[in-house]
Amino acid sequence: MPDHQEGEGRRVTAANRRAVGNLGEDLAAEYLHRAGYEVLDRNFYTRYGELDLVARTPEDDLAFIEVKYRTSASDGGGVAAVGPRKLRRIRTLAGLWLEQNREGVQFSGGLRVDVIDVGPDGVREHVEGVW
């Protein structure tokens, strides 16, 4: 008789989620670098949440980037997972990031929020300026 419960091998743990999140962020950061972006920060944590990536765009905008890793595009993809509540949180976090990094970052463009949908084979979609 097996010494584990059925389905135990499929249990998602915080460590697994973090590892998958890191993989998605690594793939997104590589994609951004190839596209001419400069990644300025990763995993900016506050009590309000986390910004996945902050990058200066080739046009000198400052982009606050939410990375969504999904194993299948059939579930609506990562972009569909970012609704109004998540956008409000990202805007709050962006303001906090700017307060803490005001001296160290220079950009001549605007501010925006992007979403990058990542799957097992890499970046599927990059939506610029969702806000």
Swiss-Prot record:
<dbReference type="InterPro" id="IPR011856">
    <property type="entry name" value="tRNA_endonuc-like_dom_sf"/>
</dbReference>
<comment type="similarity">
    <text>Belongs to the UPF0102 family.</text>
</comment>
<dbReference type="InterPro" id="IPR011335">
    <property type="entry name" value="Restrct_endonuc-II-like"/>
</dbReference>
<dbReference type="GO" id="GO:0003676">
    <property type="term" value="F:nucleic acid binding"/>
</dbReference>
<protein>
    <recommendedName>
        <fullName>UPF0102 protein jk1180</fullName>
    </recommendedName>
</protein>
<dbReference type="InterPro" id="IPR003509">
    <property type="entry name" value="UPF0102_YraN-like"/>
</dbReference>
<dbReference type="Pfam" id="PF02021">
    <property type="entry name" value="UPF0102"/>
</dbReference>
